[in-house]
From Swiss-Prot:
It comes from Xanthomonas oryzae pv. oryzae (strain PXO99A). It catalyses: XMP + L-glutamine + ATP + H2O = GMP + L-glutamate + AMP + diphosphate + 2 H(+). The gene is guaA. The active site is at residues 85, 177, 179. This is GMP synthase [glutamine-hydrolyzing]. Residues 8-203 form the Glutamine amidotransferase type-1 domain. Pfam families: GATase, GMP_synt_C, NAD_synthase.
């Protein structure tokens, strides 16, 4: 079987918001890569076996004392090195060049003139055939003097060194960000570094990943049974499909129907996994327990804790009935791993980690199976399609762990959940009909616990309000509200009010993030 980890790239993270995007672009090329904090134990670099090293951007300044630096082992390794933004600046500063604060910080589109055709830039031109690239800049400092042995390969009107290289050492640097889509030929530059300069084979494909994980899972669990908390979300669904292919009936999924899921989602999950794929699924109808626990609770955090703790309690109860289960499968993905690892100094960018299954009782004593822990979300989706899951399931919008519990403002009641689930289904149905669903990042309905005066027939009505929310975003850290057509919104509003008894008004949320969050609670 092909060893898909043979050729790989190491990315040292200096805290850039785009570091994970660099890794995703490398993976899209077909090459495995890992992200390590810049202050990761340098003695492990040689043992990792990378074919090349990328130094990411970052928010620090090389002109200040104590700025993050690349370990000397990077330069002693003999490997190709590619510095991006801050990565190029520290490359210059550490190897005998100089950096300085720019008179003006540069953010956004820029034109880079290629003045020396090295292995990165040879033959690259703009649409008119000129040696010029449209790129994305995001920096305050810049390289003012290249180190000995380096050549300036690109420049702009604002900075003298937009790119540099030492071809003998195979060391390269660019001040712009090739990983973002605004840099039009950025993927070509990354491919040239990874494939042409580093010599990596493109072995990282969905089919190869599936074969690799099946072999790993079989070796890890042997003849033991595995249990999985199946939520119906993308990650757990892909884990279920992958493990079923690997170990068949040795997998048992526990699906807890909380009563807070999307419209008819419980039936859809059972139809897909139990009936169509033949996966062993235990469905626990726990709606009564959830609504009883949530009665009178309106604080969002309190609701989250109740919903999460009750899931753990129910999952524990069901696992006790499976005496042969020795392993717990989780849908942990690579960003969870990166965020949990963090940095020794705290200078690397650390985001809160989000675990698919957290706080499970210690007495369960189960080993962990995490077949997605090397994968980004987009890779998980591609695996799902390769495994035969419907595209509508694999590419659907994010849904919060507590479900409708945090889309019902205030106290959660069964009748509110049923009303909201139906309203949400109407919104999503119309988005799909209008071919808008895949053009926005997330869309959903929210139940507002306020009543509004309306007129139904000839009678006065005093009924509930439903809010619609749709956003466009790349990373969910910031988001713009989606400019949906007025006629479309009118159609959705009419359907909700006409089809759902108890709703007299529909409103559309036009708040961005920040200041608002995407979810209302």
């Amino acid at each position: 079987m092909t060893n898909i980890h043979t050729d790989k790239i190491l990315i040292l993270d200096f805290g850039a918001q785009y570091t994970q995007l660099i890794a995703r672009r490398i993976r899209e090329i077909g090459v495995y890569c890992e992200i390590w904090a810049w202050d990761h134990d340098p003695s492990e670099i040689a043992g990792f076996g990378a074919k090349g090293i990328i130094l990411s951007g970052g928010p620090e300044s090389t002109t200040l004392p104590g700025a993050p630096v690349a370990p000397q082992e990077v330069f002693d390794s003999g490997l190709p090195v590619f510095g991006i933004c801050y990565g190029m600046q520290t490359l210059a500063a550490q190897l005998g060049g100089a950096t300085e604060a720019a008179d003006q910080r540069e953010f956004g589109h820029a034109e880079v003139d290629v003045i020396a055709a090295d292995a990165l830039f040879a033959g690259l031109t703009d649409h008119a055939g000129a040696p010029r690239l449209n790129v994305w800049m995001s920096h305050g400092d810049h390289v003012s003097q290249v180190p000995p042995g380096f050549t300036i390969t690109a420049t702009t009107d604002r900075i003298p060194v937009a790119a540099m290289s030492n071809e003998d050492k195979r060391w390269y640097g660019v001040q712009f960000h090739p990983e973002v889509t605004h840099t039009l030929q950025g993927q070509t530059l990354l491919r040239r570094f990874v494939v042409d300069i580093c010599g990596c084979q493109t072995l990282w494909t969905a089919a190869n990943i599936i074969d690799d994980q099946i072999a790993r899972v079989r070796e890890q669990v042997g003849d033991d049974d595995v249990i999985l908390g199946l939520s119906g979300g993308v990650d757990s669904s892909v884990v279920a499909a992958l493990l079923h292919k690997a170990i068949g009936d040795k997998l048992t999924c526990v699906f807890v129907d909380t009563g807070l899921l999307r419209w008819q989602e419980g039936d859809q999950v059972m139809a897909m996994f139990a009936e169509h794929m033949g996966v062993k699924v235990i469905r626990v109808n726990a709606a009564d327990r959830y609504f009883a626990k949530l009665e009178g609770v309106s604080d969002p955090e309190a609701k989250r804790k109740i919903i999460g703790n009750l899931f753990v309690e129910i999952f524990d109860e069901e696992s006790n009935t499976l005496a042969n289960a020795k392993w717990l499968a989780q849908g942990t993905i690579y960003p969870d791993v990166i965020e949990s690892a963090g940095s020794k100094t705290g200078k690397a960018h650390v985001i809160k980690s989000h675990h698919n299954v957290g706080g499970l009782p210690q007495h369960m004593k189960l080993g962990l199976v995490e077949p997605l822990r090397e994968l980004f979300k987009d890779e998980v989706r591609r695996l799902g399609v390769e495994l035969g899951l419907p595209r509508t399931m694999v590419y659907r919008h994010p849904f919060p762990g507590p479900g409708l519990g945090v889309r019902i403002l205030g106290e959660v009641k069964r009748e509110y959940a049923e009303l909201l689930a139906k309203a949400d289904a109407i919104f999503i149905d119309e988005l799909r009909k209008a071919d808008l669903y895949d053009k926005i990042s997330q869309a959903f309905a929210v139940f507002l616990p306020v009543k509004s005066v309306g007129v139904v027939g000839d009678a006065r009505a005093y009924e509930w309000v439903i809010a619609l929310r749709a956003v466009e975003t790349i990373d969910f850290m910031t988001a713009h509200w989606a400019h949906l057509p007025y006629d479309f919104l009118g159609t959705v509003s009419n359907r909700i009010i006409n089809e759902l008894r108890g709703v007299s008004r529909v409103v559309y949320d036009i708040s961005g993030k920040p200041p608002a969050t995407i979810e209302w609670e």
